[in-house]
From Swiss-Prot:
Region of interest called Tail, as start-end residue ranges on this chain: 363-407
Chain spans, region Coil 1A: 56-90
Annotated region described as Linker 12, given as residue ranges: 203-218
Protein name: Keratin, type I cuticular Ha2
Species assigned in the record: Mus musculus (Mouse)
Record-linked Gene3D superfamilies: 1.20.5.170, Single helix bin, Vasodilator-stimulated phosphoprotein
Region feature Head, mapped onto this chain: 1-55
UniProt entry keywords in alphabetical sequence: Coiled coil, Intermediate filament, Keratin
More details: There are two types of hair/microfibrillar keratin, I (acidic) and II (neutral to basic).
Gene that this polypeptide is encoded by: Krt32
A GO cellular component entry from the record: intermediate filament
């Protein structure tokens, strides 16, 4: 019966190849003869029932390669676990380092915002107070101007009354001069009358009294006396009326002057008080202006400081986000590498299972008598193989327990 060859394909693990069986290889009743290539990464043919020294070395190399693959898989799994642990530690450390507690900063910002709001409210209250003070100052200024106008009117009235008083004084002096002249004239008339009476008495002397039945003579003395009494009464009445009128006018003027003086003093005291109030309000206004300027400066400094702090925090957040993106990229890359390694592991396990199945199937087909195999016929060419390789006629095939001890 012709011998049937079983071609096998083997490639390095880096190429992620699989071992497969050709469809032309069929099981045989004879002891198999095989052709195995000793070069790595090329096609090898394993024929049933044929083993030589090169084949043993090849099996040893395959065993070593499988052991190296398994060791490499375990090492890669170990390194992968270590890398995952390191990544987790670094991620947790960076999260703890790059995400500090900003609650204190937020609390400080809220407190400063409350202070700013309170300061704004205080500024508004101060502005309202200043406006009220300005309105009060305007009212006081209006009152002052009104009182000043009244004072000027009162002073004008007082000056007019003083002119009237001067005129009355002049009229009084004229009337007194007239009274004196009338008194002198009356005295002159009296002296003249007495002189005339004396002259008439001297002229009559011892003359006889001739009584004539006629109308009674006019008593000039009595008439003059009556006229004098009338004039004196008129003069006294006029003098008394003038004095009363003058006294009344003087009393009224004195009252007006006293009232005006009191009002003037009260106005002067009010003006002094208003000036003091205006000075106090101006001082308070300047103090409020300085306080407002200082508060505005403090507010500007606070806003600038917190703006810089917020910009720094924003830069920190940007850096943290960039680091997180880098970490995510690293994690994705390592995840891809891990998936590739898992794929390599799965392929290696599949390849190992294939080798194990091949070895077990060959072990079940090979007999335990090592040197009882006759010479085999030349191998027929198989599909998919470019050339036919023949093995020697006498081959010593190891038994199944020997192969199992190797693997």
């Amino acid at each position: 019966m012709p011998s049937v060859c079983m071609p096998t394909t083997y490639r390095p693990a880096s190429c992620l190849s699989k071992t497969y069986l050709s469809s032309s290889c069929q099981p045989s009743n004879r002891r198999p003869t095989g052709c195995i290539s000793s070069s790595m990464g090329t096609y090898g043919l394993f024929c049933e029932g044929a083993f030589n020294g090169n084949e043993k070395e090849t099996m040893q190399v395959l065993n070593d390669r499988l052991a190296n693959y398994l060791e490499k898989v375990r090492q890669l799994e170990k390194e992968n676990a270590e890398l995952e642990g390191k990544i987790q530690d670094v991620y947790q450390g960076q999260v703890l380092t790059m995400c500090p507690d900003y609650q204190s900063y937020f609390q400080t910002i809220e407190e400063l915002q409350q202070k700013v709001l309170c300061t704004k409210a205080e500024n508004a209250r101060m502005i309202v107070h200043i406006d009220n003070a300005k309105l009060a100052a305007d009212d006081f200024r209006t009152k002052y101007e009104t009182e000043l106008a009244l004072r000027q009117l009162v002073e004008a009235d007082t000056n007019g009354l003083r002119r009237i008083l001067d005129e009355l004084t002049l009229n009084k002096a004229d009337l007194e001069a007239q009274v004196e002249s009338l008194k002198e004239e009356l005295l002159c008339l009296k002296r003249n009358h007495e002189e005339e009476v004396g002259v008439l008495r001297q002229q009559l002397g011892d003359r006889l009294n001739i009584e004539v039945d006629a109308a009674p003579p006019v008593d000039l003395t009595r008439m003059l006396e009556e006229m004098r009494c009338q004039y004196e009464t008129m003069v006294e009445t006029n003098h008394r009326d003038v004095e009363e009128w003058f006294n009344m006018q003087m009393e009224e003027l004195n009252k007006q002057v006293a009232t005006s003086s009191e009002q003037l003093q009260s106005y002067q005291s009010d003006i002094i008080d208003l000036r003091r109030t205006v000075n106090t309000l101006e001082i308070e206004l300047q103090a409020q202006h300085s306080l407002r300027d200082s508060l505005e400066n403090t507010l500007g400094e606070t806003e600038g400081r917190f703006t810089s702090q917020l910009s720094q925090m924003q830069c920190m957040i940007t850096n943290v986000e960039s680091q997180l993106s880098d970490i995510r990229c690293d994690l994705e890359r390592q995840n891809q590498e891990y998936k590739v390694l898992l794929d390599v592991k799965a392929r290696l396990e599949c390849e190992i299972d294939t080798y194990r199945g091949l070895l077990e199937s060959e072990d079940s087909k090979l007999p335990c008598n090592p040197c009882s195999t006759p010479s085999c016929q030349p191998c027929a060419p198989s599909p998919g193989v470019s050339r036919t390789v023949c093995v020697p006629h006498t081959v010593c095939v190891p038994c199944s327990p020997c192969l199992q001890t190797r693997y």
